[in-house]
Amino acid sequence: MPPVPRLPGRDAVPRVVVIGAGFGGLAVAQGLANSGTIITIVDRQNHHVFQPLLYQVATAGLSPADIAAPIRSIVKRQKETRVLLAEVTGVNTSQRHVLLSDGNTLEYDALVIATGARHSYFGRDEWAEHAPGIKTIDDATKVRRNILLAMERAETIRQESLPDRDEYLTFVVVGGGPTGVELAGAIAELTRHATDMDFRFITRRCLRIILVEAGERLLPTFPAKLGDAARKALEGLGVLIRLNGRVTDIGDYGVRIGDERIATTTVIWAAGVQASDAAKWLDADADRSGRVKVEPDLSVPGHPEIFVIGDTASLVDASGRPVPGVAPAAKQEGMHVARSLLARFTGRRAPLPFRYRNWGNLATIGRKRAVAEIGTLRISGLPAWLLWSTAHIYFLVGFRNRIAVGANWLWNYLTFETPR
């Protein structure tokens, strides 16, 4: 692979701009540490968020600080790395400039776009106001506030027959993938525990937690046996499962599934994602979800100096399988890009085309309940939950966060007290 050519007048020291400080972006920056490369990380937030656990912030299982870490603290030992709090509005590929919302630009010799994805409402963006998703700390705290306020308001209505009370105590999660399953289970445990311990005029039989999935089963990317195990675990928590349920409208009143109108004040969206605007910035080919179609080395066709990774990229890897938009894949892609850039800048042989190593699929359904697929191994129940917990603590960024989350989970497991 030839080295990346530099434009005339540029410094001899390579400049790498990384847009996005998620799993993939940080893996690139850390992989280039102490390489003599000037690295600039650009992000709209000054902290990295462990997104797989955002749902636990939304359901009062963890505090926001437990799953967030300042980006500058993560790379503080990398003297050649700087962090820029800014919003990217475009890329000038001919001049190799990243365009920022404040009018400034950043020069690059190599660019890595790891901007992730946002929620997709399948052309009904007006639903977002009534059915927020959970992609950021702000999203999670908003959902948590909505859930807890709904229960507080229901507590003030003493007569169980009043319709307003039912609306406050009905919680609808749209989407039966891992996020939706984990969220529905966590809401069920939170609300059941709260009614037992904290409230005086709400009982478990007043609650309705509804999980809506458009397909024929939950967890469609998992083996059918594990999807069935997840369904049974959720039903054991009192969650109502609506399979083959097509959401036709969401508004102030609640949600409509087919012809059925469900009155609720809390609808949470976990049904689909759309890639960031990277394809528009680059004028690149994209798939139906807006993800940039990349080469086997994760570079953009026609632009060997630009890489796209994580949820923003669409790739069928060397094994012939599509790379999923999950945290382990983004991290592996980031490490691969870092190795590729080091090879290019030093004139060494490039690594082989990217190949995703799938370490398995995990999803939890409350305390002591989870499903796991690790190679040919398929397990559920407590062993899967312990595996899920260990894996998530391992991938957390920062020793403090690992200790805090582990301690919180142990305390919650023993006492079920939640840091609200």
Predicted regions and their residues:
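Rossmann-like dinucleotide-binding core of oxidoreductases
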Residues: 164-222, 229, 240-242, 324-343, ...
